[in-house]
Amino acid sequence: MIGRKEKERERPYYRDPDDPEYIKDLQRPAVIKEDLSEMERRKRVQQILESKSFCHELEEVIRQECDTARTDPDHLQVLQKLSDLTVPQGNMSFGNLHTYGGNTIAIADLRGNEKYSKAERIQRNKLACLFRLADLFQWSQGIHNEISYRTNDEDNTFLMNPFGLLYHEITAATIVKIDENGKILDCGTLKAGVNQPAFLLHSAIYKAHPMVRCILHMHTAIVAAVASMKCGLLPLCKEAMVLGPVGYHDYQDIGDDDIQFDEIIANLGDKNVLFLRNQGFLVVGDTIEHATFLANNTVIACETQVRAARAGLDNLIIPEEKAIQRAFRNSRNTNSLKRNGTVDWRVGELEWESWMRVLDHANFQTGHVYRQPQLRPKSAMSTSMVNNNDVAVPPTTSAYGQIDETNLESVSAHRLALLRKEQERVRWMNSPNAYQKVEFLEYGADNPKKITKWVHDVNVPSASGTPVKISSVHQFSPASSNPKEFKEKQKAIKENNRLGTLSAGPQSQILDSVTYEDIALLIKPDNDGTVGQSSTADRAILIGTASKGIIDRQFQHHAQVYHQIYAPNPFSVETDADIKKYVDMVKAKNSQSAPVSARSGYSQYDEVEADTVSLMQGVREHKLSQAALSASDDGLNAGISPNNVRTSEESVNTSYMSQSVVFDCDHPSPMSISTEYPEKVKMTRFSSTQGTSEGNTTSRSCTTASEEEKPTKDEKKKKKKGFLSFMRKKDK
């Protein structure tokens, strides 16, 4: 036994003697240590005092202590100062009688008051719940209704509702405690009295029937209507049958001095329900649950009779006496109320527990001790933040910081964090306990590989498993015996950060078929000085992006790489001299294309300068320069003069850069620029070889045709619609 206890004992904390913090703490003077400890203590006290929950509890204690009968001057003075500082000033606010809305009055409000025993607390909570049910069922009529309960002590004391309060205002702390003579022993938190003449009737019944523990005296309208009938209550329904025999009494005002309680007691006899003619009814029960059960059935039976009486009393069907007696015996037979042989329910207890669940769901805080904890409302269940079960709580951070309750943003962020933690806990608790290994083949790749996944095993029931006893909080994560382990790990992390050895990890070769360093080697200039443009087909470089199957674990079996041809930057090898030469060329081309633009009715550029040149224009000029150079080389090789080549080049540049509409002689419709450009290059090369400029002739002939046709304004508008916005001529 001793060895088992030593095994379950927590491992002691080992202090590292070489720890710098520990050495500083030993060298620190005692005065400074005391100051630091006092600062920490005051900080903790300040945090508690600023807590809203602590202020709420303190206000409740002050309210209850102020209402006690203690008359010590010092005690009252201290309470007065505390109440001035904490308790908000203002009158007591009550909700509507039947519409509570969001401001509900708690039933079990006995907090921080130890003058009541545990048994009396339960009795007060239960009686206060009965008052709240009577209000919700609309049994009460104003303040002239009385419910009393005999306590379990030997002093023959009673609990009764304070006179002047409506039933929805009564709580466990406001109930008045009196003796058999009506003397107030505890006036509750509101210091209210009781209806003395009404309690005299209750006291007389308690003396005549020692087994009676609870009495209800109600003036419900529907019951008063049945009590005024000569026929009385008829056994028309099951609710009327379970009441058994009922008594009747010709009611007189209780305030009269000559009233005889013996007559009321005689009419009541051994019955549980007594109808007071033209006034209401009186219910006596062995327990609060029994009395509530009888009162509820009485009201329902009276409602049934009043509705059925519209057809006439002669037309009503009365059950046989045997059926009535059988229904009464079944309601009193406690053996028939057993559920699976585990719980013995007395009369009214099962219905009472269901009503308590209704009240707790409505956040009335009944304080009821449930006999069926599994049916207890979740809103009323107390949740503990301390849980030694490592399986119930998912792995997460265990540090808790202090929340500034005055900052709304921090409070809202804290609530969101708690919500996320609860969602993670639900996901963790609902995760399967049994898994099976499943392998998938990757598709979309040349060499597919196997992807292993662990999924829920549907063949194993969820309730199966081996229970494990949690004997220690470090059962699944044992504490280390080396006190220097944390410091060594911390120093190693700091050293790695200082050296800069951390990296993003290995570079993925799946995302890119070739790296940019390899591309730079592949696009080196040839022997003739050209870079990549003359041999694009031979140097097709594929780059690509991968699907989310490479990143997302759920799609590992469907990993694909999407390729595209690498397009280098056309200006990556250009120097400053080439760019300046290009700018001069653009200016020269604009000056040459000005007459053509004027004849065509539009212009492409407006004073193109080095700062205003667009990238698209530069790409076009770069392509034209390459085409012109190739045409010039072909012309020189064929023996053509440079003037003819220049004329051909000017025709190409004029027809392409000015973006003029080129018409074929047979087809007057305009042709697209993108499809026309390669054909013009071929025509230029062909004309250079033959010694003629067919492209120039075509351009001139088409231009002459356009001048001779002299299109109308509508045709000009149609032509302008086919060009880009920056190509149109600006209106001055």
From Swiss-Prot:
GO terms for cellular component: cytoplasm; cytoskeleton; plasma membrane; postsynaptic density. Signal peptide: none annotated. InterPro entries: Aldolase-II_Adducin_sf, Aldolase_II/adducin_N, Aldolase_II/adducin_N_sf. GO terms for molecular function: actin filament binding. Residues 1-22, 684-732 are annotated as: Disordered. Keywords: Actin-binding, Cell membrane, Cytoplasm, Cytoskeleton, Membrane. Residues 685-705 have a biased composition (Polar residues). The keyword Transmembrane helix does not apply. It is found in: Cytoplasm, Cytoskeleton; Cell membrane. The keyword Plastid does not apply. It is a peripheral membrane protein. Residues 716-732 have a biased composition (Basic residues). GO terms for biological process: actin filament bundle organization; barbed-end actin filament capping; long-term memory; memory; receptor localization to synapse; short-term memory. PANTHER family: ADDUCIN, PROTEIN HU-LI TAI SHAO. Membrane-cytoskeleton-associated protein that promotes the assembly of the spectrin-actin network. Plays a role in time-dependent memmory loss and the retention of conditioned behavior over time. This is Adducin-related protein 1. It comes from Caenorhabditis elegans. The lineage of its organism: Eukaryota, Metazoa, Ecdysozoa, Nematoda, Chromadorea. The gene is add-1.
